[in-house]
């Protein structure tokens, strides 16, 4: 019975104690109590934890991630000095997106077996777009409508490009992920027309993008701060974004070799970053 309890949990870490209790029940044995199930799992080192949410990555993209990480493993802060990292992010007005639990051994939070795979989605919150370089932060841009290629072009033309040219210089290199609207013919033509160089970027690689650390920084500072409407929430986000010190930027750019090495060590699977 004890071995079955542990086996069922290892086969599906998202099973609750109640589910496991029902699965291991047999006609010829006494049904274990929930307390017994939980105790056996804890004895086996399987404690209830919140899973790390990471994207599911295809084999092709894992190979590409490792190749990119190896190519940039020894880049230092100066190598990234003329690069502009970008991304958009969603912040809830209040509440959460829901909490799921899994059982896993200590120290295995980022093991793919114990991660909760996610897909991008929108709705019901404040969406923002931002970018930064090694010398400056751009003005945070609020996204009020559906983020299509035309909205993205407006952001590039009227927010990103003027800021990048004035703070980084004309020879900046722009980073973006491979979202379809970013790679559409319409946007590719904009980059060609405006003579903007792009950083080759592996798909499904938010953990390689240092701007993710900035989104986490903003989230930590606004979490628990109530906003009565979307305008107030955006004001909160903007205040935190503008207050990020350049020492934080230096730190996350210095983390790039570690990010690359971690991706290599993980064979392209999602990492802790």
Curated annotation (Swiss-Prot):
A Pfam family hit: DDE_3
Broad class of where this protein is predominantly found: nucleus
Keyword DNA-binding: yes
GO terms for MF: DNA binding
GO CC terms: nucleus
UniProt cross-references to InterPro entries, sorted A to Z: RNaseH_sf, Tc1-like_DDE_dom, Transposase_5, Transposase_Tc1-like
Subcellular localization(s) per the UniProt record: Nucleus
Record keyword DNA-binding present: yes
GO biological process: DNA integration; DNA transposition
Record keywords, A-Z: DNA integration, DNA recombination, DNA-binding, Nucleus, Transposable element
Function, as annotated: Probably essential for transposable element Tcb2 transposition.
Membership in a protein family: Belongs to the transposase 5 family.
Protein name: Transposable element Tcb2 transposase
Species whose genome carries this gene: Caenorhabditis briggsae
């Amino acid at each position: 019975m004890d071995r079955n309890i542990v086996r069922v949990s290892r086969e599906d870490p998202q099973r609750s104690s109640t589910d496991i209790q029902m699965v291991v029940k047999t006609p010829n044995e006494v049904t274990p109590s929930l307390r017994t199930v939980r105790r056996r799992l804890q004895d086996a080192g399987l404690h209830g934890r919140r899973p790390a949410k990471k994207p599911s990555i295809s084999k092709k993209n894992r190979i590409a991630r490792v190749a990119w990480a190896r190519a940039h493993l020894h880049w230092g802060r100066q190598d990234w000095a003329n690069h502009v990292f970008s991304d958009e992010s969603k912040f809830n007005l209040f509440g959460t997106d829901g909490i799921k639990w899994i059982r896993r051994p200590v120290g295995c939070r980022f093991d793919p077996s114990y991660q909760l795979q996610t897909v991008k989605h929108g709705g019901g919150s404040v969406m923002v777009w931002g970018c930064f370089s090694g010398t400056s932060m751009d003005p945070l841009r609020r996204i009020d409508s559906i983020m299509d290629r035309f909205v993205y072009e407006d952001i590039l033309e009227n927010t990103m490009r003027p800021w990048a040219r004035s703070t980084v210089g004309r020879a900046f290199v722009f980073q973006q992920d491979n979202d379809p609207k970013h790679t559409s013919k319409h946007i590719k033509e904009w980059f060609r027309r405006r003579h903007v160089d792009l950083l080759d970027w592996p798909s499904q690689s938010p953990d390689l993008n240092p701007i993710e650390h900035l989104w986490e920084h903003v989230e930590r500072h606004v979490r628990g701060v109530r906003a009565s409407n979307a305008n107030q929430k955006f004001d909160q986000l903007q205040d935190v974004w503008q207050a990020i010190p350049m020492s934080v930027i230096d730190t996350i750019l210095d983390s790039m070799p570690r990010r690359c090495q971690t991706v290599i060590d993980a064979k392209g699977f999602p990492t802790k970053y």
